[in-house]
A protein has these predicted regions:
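Conserved beta-strand -> loop -> alpha-helix junction used to position metal-binding or nucleic-acid-contacting
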Residues: 70-115
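Short, Lys/Arg-enriched charge-dense amphipathic segments
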Residues: 4-5, 9, 32, 88-97, ...
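Intrinsic-disorder/low-complexity, polar/charged segments
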Residues: 49-53, 90, 122-129
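Alpha-helix capping at helix-to-loop junctions
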Residues: 36, 62, 87, 100-108, ...
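Acidic/histidine-rich catalytic cores and adjacent linkers
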Residues: 65, 72-76, 118-182
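RNase H-like nuclease fold core
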Residues: 1-85, 162, 169, 173
């Protein structure tokens, strides 16, 4: 039994774009229109690059689609490519970024708190999330500034650099985390 393909109807869309890898150098760049319940673009890629997303956008626009907003994984170059439309950072990807820095099973109180704040990302709004993350930073500011000196070289480095990176990621991505609420 064959599946009847739905007719192609160019229209304004809210798109979700991401690259999924199945092997180290084999992935697929997909742009999906969730309200249509279909993938509008798919292309095999070896690496996740801005060009892969650019080709997808060109393909959709050439076929008559107008991207009204897009959900992205958060790669900065890709954001620039879609800078003319509202961009929503994927909450799953933001949580994965946070889990990657201080780990998914943190031991330090500051890391546990930041993970808890991030876990609530899908159940909050921009104002409350911003207030919470700012209060956390104010409380943990001196902890984040702690430095360790290497006894061999005499050079210093931030003791909690992975936690600092996690916080910085949230601050950089904050303008894109609640686009859907605007």
């Amino acid at each position: 039994m064959s599946v009847k393909e739905q007719p192609h109807v160019p229209q304004p869309i809210v798109a979700i774009a991401d690259v999924t890898f199945f092997k180290r150098s084999f992935g697929v760049c997909v742009i999906r229109a969730p309200h249509l319940k279909k993938n509008l673009y798919a292309q095999e890629v070896q690496t996740e690059s801005v060009d892969a997303y650019k080709q997808g956008r060109i393909n959709l626009e050439d076929r008559g689609y107008t991207i009204k907003a897009i959900v992205l994984a958060g790669r900065p170059g890709v954001r620039q490519l879609f800078g003319d439309v509202p961009i929503q950072m994927c909450h799953f990807h933001q949580k994965q970024i946070i889990a990657r820095y201080p780990t998914n099973n943190p031991k330090l109180a500051a890391s546990i708190e930041l993970k808890k704040i991030t876990d609530a990302l899908c159940q909050t709004n921009e104002r409350d999330f911003t207030d919470t993350i700012n209060k956390w930073h104010q409380k943990r500011s001196s902890f984040l500034k702690e430095r360790t000196t290497d006894p061999l070289t005499g050079k210093w480095f931030y003791t909690h650099k992975r936690l600092r990176s996690a916080y910085r990621s949230l601050k950089i991505n904050l303008p894109y985390l609640f686009t859907y609420q605007k």
